[in-house]
């Protein structure tokens, strides 16, 4: 058994949290994760006052009547679980130098991300984007293994999904021109950047499926890291032929070892399956017992790192808006690549 770090230390002086948004991700992940880690939620605001009041009554915190009332809170961390096009306006209203967690994506496109970055710079906000996959126990353990040299130099990274995602759960997706990469595979692209650094570019194709009207649910992408590192993603959310051959896996190979990851939440969503991490350093595959899962443990780890940065316990903010902007640039490049023609075959002479 390999003993690897799987959690982020909690802040010594945790700050209360004010949440914007009372949607399903807040109900199912943010609130349960924060309370399980003994963070205090001071209050919540949502334009749907009934939803906000129901959560406030259930958990014993305040439901603010207006966004302005929520934004006026002092000495808190603001958690923006809001639609991407709403982020910038809320950020403009927050106190100078506030600590903020912004729901991914960082805007609906790169222009939106650039506006969010401008606001955060202008108001000196200590803002991170909620790319919480980096903070999943299995990914923290993988990061620890890589940092300790167990895999050597990482030279191959494969992300392979063949799942049956219930897109109908999210009514707001109907009519959106960008779905799969912007709202799902963005997690994988961000995590890949955290391991391999920034690619030189990307070749990508994203498309929908004849069975539904969601704009894009399948993606193939190759990230260009030069002549030494290979990175490819094959993403299919329409594999509706039973569990037997479905998969949600990362295979990461280095010059000394390899890692296999099974991302359980995407299989039988939203119930999911347990995550799996196995590592092979030359003597066979060894399972790493995991003490939590992507959903919901990563949300508490993500909040803990932000709070430790804001309170001066850590010098670096992971997935801050400066770094997250580059993930958005990669997403934008993938969509631009998909819209561009591929290299054509030569005509037969």
Predicted regions and their residues:
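C-terminal helix-rich "cap/oligomerization" subdomain common to oxidoreductases
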Residues: 1-14, 77-80, 226, 305-349
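N-terminal Rossmann-like dinucleotide-binding module
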Residues: 1-59
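Beta-loop-alpha module in the N-terminal Rossmann-like domain of NAD(P)-dependent dehydrogenases
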Residues: 59-119
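Hydrophobic residues in well-ordered beta-strands that form the structural core
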Residues: 102-103, 127-129, 158, 261
């Amino acid at each position: 058994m390999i003993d690897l770090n799987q959690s982020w230390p909690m802040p010594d002086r945790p700050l209360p949290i004010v949440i914007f948004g009372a949607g399903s991700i807040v109900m199912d992940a943010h609130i349960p994760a924060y309370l399980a880690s003994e963070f205090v939620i001071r209050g919540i605001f949502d334009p749907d006052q009934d939803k906000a009041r129901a959560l406030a009554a259930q958990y014993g915190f305040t439901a603010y009547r207006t966004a302005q009332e929520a934004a006026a809170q002092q000495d808190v961390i603001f958690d923006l679980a809001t639609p991407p096009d709403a982020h910038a306006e809320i950020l403009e209203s927050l106190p100078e130098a506030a600590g903020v967690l912004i729901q991914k994506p960082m805007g609906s496109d790169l222009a939106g991300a650039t506006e969010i970055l401008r606001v955060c710079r202008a108001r000196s906000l200590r803002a991170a984007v909620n790319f919480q996959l980096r903070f999943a126990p299995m990914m923290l353990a993988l990061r620890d293994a890589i940092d300790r040299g167990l895999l050597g130099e990482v030279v191959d990274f494969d992300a392979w999904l063949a799942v049956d995602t219930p897109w109908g759960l999210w009514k707001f997706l109907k009519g959106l021109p960008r779905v799969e990469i912007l709202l799902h595979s963005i997690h994988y692209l961000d995590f890949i950047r955290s391991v391999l650094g920034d690619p030189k570019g990307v070749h990508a194709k994203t498309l929908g499926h004849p069975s539904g009207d969601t704009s894009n649910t399948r993606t193939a992408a190759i990230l260009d890291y030069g002549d030494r590192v290979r990175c490819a993603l094959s993403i299919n959310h329409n594999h509706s032929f039973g569990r037997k051959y479905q998969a949600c896996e990362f295979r990461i190979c280095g010059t000394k070892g390899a890692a296999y990851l099974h991302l359980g939440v995407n299989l039988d969503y939203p119930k999911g399956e347990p995550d799996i991490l196995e590592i092979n350093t030359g003597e066979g595959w060894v399972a790493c017992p995991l003490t939590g899962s992507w959903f919901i443990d990563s949300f508490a780890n993500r909040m803990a790192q932000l709070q430790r940065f804001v309170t001066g316990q850590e010098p670096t903010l992971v997935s801050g808006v400066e770094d997250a902007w580059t993930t958005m640039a990669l997403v934008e490049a993938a969509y631009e690549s998909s819209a561009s023609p591929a290299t054509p075959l030569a005509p037969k002479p």
